[in-house]
Amino acid sequence: MQQQKPLEGAQLVIMTIALSLATFMQVLDSTIANVAIPTIAGNLGSSLSQGTWVITSFGVANAISIPLTGWLAKRVGEVKLFLWSTIAFAIASWACGVSSSLNMLIFFRVIQGIVAGPLIPLSQSLLLNNYPPAKRSIALALWSMTVIVAPICGPILGGYISDNYHWGWIFFINVPIGVAVVLMTLQTLRGRETRTERRRIDAVGLALLVIGIGSLQIMLDRGKELDWFSSQEIIILTVVAVVAICFLIVWELTDDNPIVDLSLFKSRNFTIGCLCISLAYMLYFGAIVLLPQLLQEVYGYTATWAGLASAPVGIIPVILSPIIGRFAHKLDMRRLVTFSFIMYAVCFYWRAYTFEPGMDFGASAWPQFIQGFAVACFFMPLTTITLSGLPPERLAAASSLSNFTRTLAGSIGTSITTTMWTNRESMHHAQLTESVNPFNPNAQAMYSQLEGLGMTQQQASGWIAQQITNQGLIISANEIFWMSAGIFLVLLGLVWFAKPPFGAGGGGGGAH
């Protein structure tokens, strides 16, 4: 990295807005389409299962391209790569919006996923490298807010657009944001390019990465639909992923110019930070996916209202993050993360105790609001720990690798959560159904009560079956909340293996 004077004043503010908007745009796009899949599939004359490839295609392409960011940044420069990625993302978004067939949409979602990969790691790296060292914690805090708020806004915005406008606007909204990001970046970072190196292309590493991570991501996305290892396709994808990733690790550790710099894991703080942020994000993101589905399927919420019930989690971080960033240099990051994990556990236990049939909007919204304290003390401190002790020229590679592990953990968390939810519901459904028989006086009393309300026996059976399904879904969700709370308490000990001092992005030690 060329040693340049950090930005100041208005230039610093404009750059912060530009990089935060780019992060917001990319994270938003990974969740905004989820609730609109039925609308998109119906409009393009496809089945719902075919429509899910709109999500899968983006996730696979994005998972492959994120780890490449460090190598690409060394090759072409961080500023240039960031600008071209933003421009390409805006163009691909427009192309997604005008797609007239599902195949066309999936093709442009792949392009969108590929060019989106560098946006988050580079926004993080450029932010840290152009901020005054004393203010880097504030920069990370502001950046973290966008990562927190965007996944919450996605389902709300996606639901509102698909309910009221053409689904194409889900993608069109990226175009003006992309243009604004490019203009602001040119104004502030032109002439501040990072040093480049003419490195040969690690073709073997690239091929293994594409095959291994691509197979793994498709397996995670398609597993639940295909009933996991009952499907030959899932078994083949798993074998291919395991073999390719094992070869990738061996190859990258022995190659002179690796496309993924695994030597970063020699840093104790990088390894501990990646582990903590990935495992915690796995639980956090799994709940982000589970909660709206539970509210829609059991409690009859619309997509928009389910999103609004999840939204309060973003309120506290918006208020607290700048304050935490301001005083971060006086705080032990491990204490903040410990507080965060305790609050996560408290909120998951809270849900497990209070989620029941007939609960109101507040029963869902209040735990989300309080969980905001956990989220505010999560991303920024763990990112600071992860990047501490690394020289500026390794920040892009470190940021891309840590964001890759976090993104992959989110996919794994989603798959595990939704699969457990479905499987446990089936088990509870079978157990609850056993009690509905002619020999159970409570069951017969319920039938009599329903028939007294004018239902036929068939209608009463259907109503009871639906209630059993709802009970099973609630019980299985509560079991997941119990398990998540327990794992957060176990994670408390892991963060204390990190070694201070924790300077944000290059400042401070960090054990090697």
From Swiss-Prot:
What is any one of the record's Gene Ontology cellular component terms?
Answer: plasma membrane
User: What NCBIfam families does this protein's entry cite?
Assistant: efflux_EmrB, EmrB
MF terms (GO), sorted A to Z: bile acid transmembrane transporter activity; transmembrane transporter activity
Question: Which SUPFAM superfamilies did the record assign?
Answer: MFS general substrate transporter (SSF103473)
Subcellular localization: Cell inner membrane
PROSITE patterns, A to Z: MFS
Describe its function.
Answer: Part of the tripartite efflux system EmrAB-TolC, which confers resistance to antibiotics such as CCCP, FCCP, 2,4-dinitrophenol and nalidixic acid.
Instruction: Name the CDD domains for this protein.
Output: MFS_LmrB_MDR_like
Tell me what this protein is called: Multidrug export protein EmrB
- Stretches that traverse the bilayer: 13-38, 52-72, 82-100, 110-128, 137-159, 165-189, 203-223, 234-249, 272-295, 306-329, 336-355, 364-387, 408-428, 482-504
Task: Note the InterPro entries from the entry.
Answer: EmrB-like, MFS, MFS_dom, MFS_trans_sf
Q: Which residues lie on this side of the membrane: Cytoplasmic?
A: 1-12, 73-81, 129-136, 190-202, 250-271, 330-335, 388-407, 505-512
Domain of life according to the entry: Bacteria
Does the keyword field hold Oxidoreductase? no
Q: Which family does it belong to?
A: Belongs to the major facilitator superfamily. EmrB family.
UniProt topology in membrane: Multi-pass membrane protein
Tell me the GO BP annotations in alphabetical order.
Answer: bile acid and bile salt transport; response to antibiotic; response to steroid hormone; response to toxic substance; transmembrane transport; xenobiotic detoxification by transmembrane export across the cell outer membrane; xenobiotic detoxification by transmembrane export across the plasma membrane
Quaternary structure note:
Part of the tripartite efflux system EmrAB-TolC, which is composed of an inner membrane transporter, EmrB, a periplasmic membrane fusion protein, EmrA, and an outer membrane component, TolC. The complex forms a large protein conduit and can translocate molecules across both the inner and outer membranes. Interacts with EmrA. EmrAB complex forms a dimer in vitro.
The scientific name of the source species is: Escherichia coli (strain K12)
Which keywords does this Swiss-Prot/TrEMBL entry list? Answer: Antibiotic resistance, Cell inner membrane, Cell membrane, Membrane, Transmembrane, Transmembrane helix, Transport
